[in-house]
């Protein structure tokens, strides 16, 4: 009887060990598949550091980040690879196709393509439309919210006319809603 119980214990331990190894290998394969599902991000810079524990890159000097759907240029970028958040400062330019977003600082999710530009300037090529604002928030694939907006279709730093307001919701299709709107020409409200 004791020999039979000893053999059953041994079989139970071996079975538990085998099941544990299967679970561990399945978890490892699942994690690798998840990593491979992530779209690649290519980072170029004069200097770069990587924190393995936090999974963050810090790139400085002529930083160029290529990601699915665009390119981010800046003097200094911290990329939180785990959360797909890039925080860029200094000469920041984000290109998404023919559209551009510039700012003193841009915090951008490279996976869902949303983010915020501070002291921002945006250009939408489809409608040849420029917007400046204290804060330009890309809320979706085709939608924006702007604080203290100034919008125009005129080229150059000093447009002949622009519409200014306190806040604005806009879509790439060219529709927008501005609060406290006023027409400004040659820098003066009309």
Where are the language model's segments positioned?
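Bacterial N-terminal signal peptides
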Residues: 14-25
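Structural signature for solvent-exposed beta-strand/loop edge elements and short helix-capping sites
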Residues: 31-190
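Disordered, low-complexity tails and leader-like regions
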Residues: 1-2, 25
């Amino acid at each position: 009887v004791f020999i039979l119980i000893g053999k059953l214990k041994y079989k139970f331990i071996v079975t538990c060990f085998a099941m544990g190894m299967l679970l561990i290998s399945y978890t490892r394969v699942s994690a690798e598949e998840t990593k491979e599902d992530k779209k690649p991000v290519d980072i170029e810079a004069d200097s770069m550091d990587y924190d393995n524990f936090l999974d963050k890159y810090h790139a400085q000097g002529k930083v160029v980040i290529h990601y699915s759907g665009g390119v981010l240029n800046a003097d200094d970028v911290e990329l939180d690879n785990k959360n797909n958040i890039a925080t860029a400062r200094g000469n920041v330019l984000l290109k998404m196709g023919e559209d551009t977003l510039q700012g003193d600082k841009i915090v951008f999710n490279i996976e869902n393509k949303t983010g915020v530009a501070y002291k921002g300037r945006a250009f939408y090529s489809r409608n040849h439309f420029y917007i400046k604002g204290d804060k330009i928030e890309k809320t979706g694939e085709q939608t924006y919210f702007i604080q203290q907006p100034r919008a125009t279709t005129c080229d150059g730093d000093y447009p002949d006319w622009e519409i200014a307001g306190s806040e604005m919701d806009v879509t790439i299709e060219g529709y927008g809603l501005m609060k406290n709107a006023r027409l400004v020409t040659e820098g003066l409200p009309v």
